[in-house]
Amino acid sequence: ARGLAQQIVAASTGDIAALSVQVQTMGREFAECGFSGALATYAVSWLNDALSQRVVALCAQGARLPAASWCWVNLGSAARQEQTLTTDQDNGLIFTASDEAEAEELRSVFLPFAREVNRQLSDAGFTLCPGDIMAGNIKWCRSLDEWVQLFYNWIHKPEPEALLNATIFFDLRPLYGDLDLASVLHQKLAQWSGGSSAQIFLRLMATNALTAEPPIGFTGDIVTEKDGKDRFIDIKKFGIRIFVDAARIMALSAGVPDADTRTRFLKAGPAFGMNERDIEATLGAMSALQRIRL
């Protein structure tokens, strides 16, 4: 994996697609060699990070970007480093601006760059997000002040859309650029989510999370979904999501800035009465589901 990562760091634009195929192949080998689900998904995510960083760097070299600080951020499973072999894009862009007028001016420059990154990532196998949660969308290419205000509104005015957005955007990790810009958002989240005014938001998030239940019927039988002649269980929706949602809520409540589920449980779990054995058992169950999903 380290040798492949070194190839990615030195890659040209024309090399990226072939290297992405190698990452997919290596990911399958991880699963076949008996890696745990957690380790295999982390390894795939680590290599995907390297690919994405290289694409962003190459696009930045070819663009005439302004002097303003900026940061490309991963969201969702990419931020949590819990990606499987098939993944789509969830990303955003943060930049600094002195006021609203400058933010609009800078956005007009950053948007074409962000859209080119999204296009090249798509060419490399990272499918465009069906919900358009990407930096090339004007809604997710924002100044730091705009992101701060947006996060504040979601926590203090928890409408249904805000709760949905929180499950994606509050799993945020800087990938490339001025990483401190993302740290500011993490600090604000920790400050706001730990306050009394955020309790309604956290309760609503918990209520929403409880709608995801294991696919077990009243008689204890497994409930499946149908796709043509085949029946299946959506492991992400009815399995992994339960762990991810719980860890997110616990981390927000405890002021833990980390995005990955394992670290969230390790750091925030004790505040919710989980001992070391509880945490390891929980993570082991999630890892087993991740391995099946690979």
Language-model-detected regions and their locations in the chain:
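Cation-handling catalytic/transport regions enriched in His/Asp/Glu
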Residues: 72-73, 81-85, 91, 128, ...
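Glycine- and acidic
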Residues: 32-41, 94-104, 226-232, 273-275
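Secondary-structure capping and boundary motifs in well-ordered enzyme cores
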Residues: 74, 78-84, 109, 113, ...
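Conserved structural-core and active-site-/substrate-pathway-adjacent residues in large, well-folded domains
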Residues: 48, 88-90, 121, 246, ...
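Active-site nucleotide-donor binding segment shared across nucleotidyl transfer reactions
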Residues: 48-106
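Conserved catalytic core of two-metal-ion nucleotidyltransferases
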Residues: 19-31, 37-54, 58, 62-64, ...
